[in-house]
C-alpha cells in the first residue's frame, strides 16, 4: 500500500491500533482520527479465523474493539488471510473477549455461566499476558480474556449472549461484516465471497 501511495494513489487511512498508526505514518500514508471522517469506504483487515459464511474471529492483536468500530462504520469490509485461517466452524482459535478491568473476574464467571447455558461447557479461559508477567492492556485500557470454547455451533447466539454481560466491552466474533475474503495460497490468491 505504501508503494502505491508513493506512486500516486490518494487514500486516507484510519488505523485501529497505535502500532499500525505509527507504522502507516512512517511509510508516508496519510492518517486521520476516525472522528474526522464523514464516512469510511473500505475496511481492509485480517482475521484469526473465517467460516464459509464469512463470520470471523478477530482480536489476536488485541485491537478488536477499535476494529469493530471501524468495520461497523465502513461501507465494505474485505479480509486478507492465509488458507490456514479458513475453517468449517469457528472456534479453533480462542475467542478474544475485551473486558473492563473493574470486576474482571466477576465478568469472567458470568461468561462461563452463560457458556454452560449455550451447551459450550466449561471452556478454559486465560487472561492475555503482555511481555513478562503482567496482564496485557489494550490501547483502550481493557483486558483480553482468551476463551478456548472449541467449535462454536452458533456464533450469532454466542455473540448475542456476550453482548448482554456487563463488563464485556466487546468480543471477537465479527458476524456479517466481511463481504469478501482474499485467501493467500502458495499458488496465488483465491477470492471467497458471499454467494
Predicted feature residues:
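Catalytic nucleophile loop
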Residues: 13-19
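Short active-site oxyanion
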Residues: 7-13, 55
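Glycine-rich N-terminal segment of FAD-binding domains in flavoprotein oxidoreductases
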Residues: 1-5
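Conserved phosphate- and dinucleotide-binding cores of soluble alpha/beta proteins
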Residues: 19-195
